[in-house]
């Protein structure tokens, strides 16, 4: 109980309890709304803590089994911290933009990753020295462009076991692809979202 209170206090201090304006709400979020204040919905942090703990336990089991959980956060305010956290735990991530087909067309995406890695190798081992300066510059630009989008999944040799979406509304394409392939999803849900769109969920 003490741990729950401590977590709830941290969420409160971080402003996690603030939802969207009432006029933007999704009625399916009613069970997770505590109150309304000045036209803004206040999220029930008791429910948030319950779902966070439930999701954390499920994610821990997936990671423990050696499977990969892919973190997705393309919103400007979340991308940096999410990529840092994903790198820290050696998990794949997508934080620049979701490349359509990243899951549903995974084999083709893997070919692009291999091309990126091949260019990186050429530039690193001196193979590119035989090229003209202009050709090397083009290669470097191509590599940088691909790395921005594909760098986070460079070591992902097969489809991830689960996705963690920082905002299921914003990452709806990733969510749709995961659902089509039966990949478990965990997501942060605001008061303007449909909480039934994903399997595991943390209502934030």
Task: Pin down the residues of each PLM region.
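Glycine-rich phosphate-binding loop
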Residues: 155-178
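Nucleotide-binding motor/catalytic cores of P-loop/tubulin-like NTPases across gene-expression machines
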Residues: 170-198
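Short hydrophobic alpha-helical runs that function as membrane-insertion/retention elements
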Residues: 69-70, 92-95, 164, 184-188
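Short His-Asn-centered micro-motif
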Residues: 72-75, 165-167
């Amino acid at each position: 109980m003490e741990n729950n209170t401590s977590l709830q206090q941290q969420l409160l201090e971080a402003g996690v309890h603030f939802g969207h304006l009432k006029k933007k709400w999704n009625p399916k979020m009613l069970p997770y709304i505590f109150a309304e204040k000045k036209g803004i919905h206040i999220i029930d942090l008791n429910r948030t803590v319950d779902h966070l703990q439930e999701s954390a336990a499920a994610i821990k089991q997936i990671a423990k089994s050696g499977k990969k959980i892919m973190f997705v956060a393309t919103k400007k305010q979340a991308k940096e911290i999410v990529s840092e956290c994903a790198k820290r735990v050696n998990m794949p991530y997508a934080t620049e933009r979701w490349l359509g087909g990243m899951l549903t067309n995974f084999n083709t995406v893997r070919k692009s990753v291999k091309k990126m890695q091949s260019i990186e190798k050429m530039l690193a081992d001196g193979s590119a020295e035989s090229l003209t300066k202009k050709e090397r510059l083009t290669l470097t630009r191509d590599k940088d462009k691909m790395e921005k989008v594909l760098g986070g999944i460079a070591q992902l040799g097969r489809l991830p076991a689960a996705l963690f979406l920082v905002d299921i509304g914003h990452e709806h394409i990733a969510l749709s692809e995961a659902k089509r392939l039966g990949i478990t999803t965990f997501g942060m849900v605001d008061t303007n979202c449909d909480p039934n769109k994903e399997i595991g969920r943390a209502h934030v």
